[in-house]
Amino acid sequence: MAFEPPQRLVRALGETYGDTAATEWLGPLPEHARTVLDHASLDAERVMAPGGRSSLVLLVRRPDDSPAALKIAPPFARPELERDALAHWNGWGAVRLLDETPDGGLLLERLHPEVSLRSLPEAKALLEAAGTVRKLWVEPPAGHGFESVAERTQRQAAAMEPYRADPTAGDLTAAALAAREELVAAPDESLLLHGCFRQGKVLGGDRAPWLAVGPEPLVGERAYDLARLVRDRVEDLVGASAGASTARRRVNKLADSLDMDRERLRGWTLFRAVESGTRALTAGRRQDAELLMEFASWL
């Protein structure tokens, strides 16, 4: 079978890591995938499409014919961090890590990739998402190599700085950067976080109804992790007549349901929305940027 990477992966790697690094990894990827499969004695069924934004995911069969998913990511995406987080969670709220191939691939339990929380009505999806993410917030393993929220957001803040002078994004960028400074000055917690938690990152499973996938793990406070979930289905929010009030209610309801400070969640939601918006501007995705900036302006 062909192992051509989905276009979403091609675009995302180029945007995140640069076209040169992406091309150098994607070029030999089909042959590399065959090598990983052969070394692990796995039979490929199909490539998951549209798939993820940082890895190639194949649905496979193990030597005993049991189903699994094989995830192959470039070294610069630090797949060992995902491995360490999944191993620490050991299936609690997240997909279970079954094995690691000699070539660095992650062999994961097979979930239902076609069924995510985005398939549920909004209220039900948010309820299930909150119940899932709370399981992931545990003490990190001793001697871990995960970066902190302060470290990750410092890099992001540096990339946002030029947008202070932008005639349309300048005020929101300044507000987001100020919110970050205040939040990291008084860190609230130091727990293991998913890092990119949203409805699309929670898939249906057999062992449990819903399990998280695709972590970009780091250590810090829960409000940072929840902030990305607040803006889920942003295109629907922006298109609704009561979008602004709905967004603010969502912040309050999620904060209250998970016993966290509303203002810290609001601050991280603002920062993460504006950070994503400025990144979209840099990549030339103006429509995405406008949606994110309008959402951020409501907070």
Question: What is each stretch, according to the model?
Answer:
Residues M1-R46:
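Juxta-kinase regulatory segment immediately upstream of eukaryotic protein kinase catalytic domains
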